[in-house]
């Protein structure tokens, strides 16, 4: 009797895509959650410059391109059998590979992301597509121009995979974790007890600052740490203020002091 085996390469390619829609769908199922929103529902509907149907189509296009490149990358770097013979699982090895991958992808994305803001042509024709979402929401996290998706996410992910030396099996967990983190950073909510808000300075409020007009030259770091913003002077501190009609609002510290 023939058995059907799903390879780690297949799972490493498609599990993060499934995780993206499941995790962002969870936020949709939670409802409006007005008292935890960083922007009102009215602002979300009125300020964003792209329809939600266009966002879904854009994300699906990017994920299709990522899947194709992931399959090619896994084919080039070897099979499950090769990985199994060269790596023995240990928590220490897993932690080391995760940390290296996080640092690599953060470094790559910071400098590419910042350059897309500095270069007027790239911003106008490519990166501005992501900034059509002035009020971010969960499933808009990967709404980008296809070329930006290739440069920022796909190549960044490939480099983190290669430099960390992780196996396809480890990649399943790392890229699923990175996907959850990215979706959470764009969820537009400040939920009590959210572990990403507790353990990471780079979170939904931090990234929300970057999506506002006053913050487009700051807070480029994504998706894990804020080190490059701090080192290179693009870190914009902010305060989280309660709105009178419910929810929260991010305000740059400089503006808060002047008021």
From Swiss-Prot:
One of its GO terms (molecular function) is sphingolipid C4-monooxygenase activity. GO terms for cellular component: endoplasmic reticulum; endoplasmic reticulum membrane; Golgi apparatus. This is Sphinganine C4-monooxygenase 2. Its EC number is 1.14.18.5. Residues 98-234 form the Fatty acid hydroxylase domain. The histidine box domains may contain the active site and/or be involved in metal ion binding. The keyword RNA-binding does not apply. Ubiquitous, with higher levels in flowers and roots. The lineage of its organism: Eukaryota, Viridiplantae, Streptophyta, Embryophyta, Tracheophyta. Involved in sphingolipid trihydroxy long-chain base (4-hydroxysphinganine) biosynthesis. Can use C18- and C20-sphinganine as substrates to produce C18- and C20-phytosphinganines (D-ribo-2-amino-1,3,4-trihydroxyoctadecane and -eicosane). Disruption phenotype: No visible phenotype; due to the redundancy with SBH1. Sbh1 and sbh2 double mutants are severely dwarfed, do not progress from vegetative to reproductive growth and have enhanced expression of programmed cell death associated-genes. Keywords: Endoplasmic reticulum, Lipid biosynthesis, Lipid metabolism, Membrane, Oxidoreductase, Transmembrane, Transmembrane helix. A motif (Histidine box-2) lies at residues 127-131. The gene is SBH2. It comes from Arabidopsis thaliana. A motif (Histidine box-3) lies at residues 206-212. The chain crosses the membrane at residues 10-30, 54-74, 91-111. PANTHER family: STEROL DESATURASE (PTHR11863). Its cofactor is Fe cation. A motif (Histidine box-1) lies at residues 113-117. Pathway: Membrane lipid metabolism; sphingolipid biosynthesis.
């Amino acid at each position: 009797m023939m058995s059907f085996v799903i390879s780690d390469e297949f799972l490493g390619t498609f599990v993060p895509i499934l995780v993206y829609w499941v995790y962002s769908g969870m936020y949709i199922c939670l409802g409006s959650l007005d008292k935890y929103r960083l922007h009102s529902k009215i602002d979300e509907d009125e300020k964003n410059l792209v329809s939600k149907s266009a966002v879904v189509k854009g994300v699906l296009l990017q994920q299709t391109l990522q899947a194709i490149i992931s399959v090619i990358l896994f084919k080039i770097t070897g099979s499950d059998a090769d990985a199994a013979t060269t790596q023995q699982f240990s928590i220490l090895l897993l932690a080391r590979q995760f940390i290296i991958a996080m640092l690599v992808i953060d470094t790559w994305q910071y400098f590419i992301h910042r350059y897309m803001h500095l270069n007027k042509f790239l911003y106008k024709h490519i990166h501005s597509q992501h900034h059509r979402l002035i009020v971010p929401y969960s499933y808009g996290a990967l709404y980008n121009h296809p070329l930006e998706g290739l440069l920022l996410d796909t190549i960044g992910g490939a480099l983190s995979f290669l430099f960390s030396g992780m196996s396809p099996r480890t990649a399943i967990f790392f890229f699923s974790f990175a996907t959850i983190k990215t979706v959470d950073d764009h969820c537009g909510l400040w939920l009590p007890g959210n572990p990403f808000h507790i353990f990471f300075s780079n979170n939904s409020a931090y990234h929300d600052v970057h999506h506002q007009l006053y913050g487009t030259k700051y807070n480029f770091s994504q998706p894990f740490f804020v080190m490059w913003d701090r080192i290179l002077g693009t870190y914009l501190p902010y305060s989280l203020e309660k709105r009178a009609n419910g929810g929260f609002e991010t305000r740059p510290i400089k503006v808060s002091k002047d008021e």
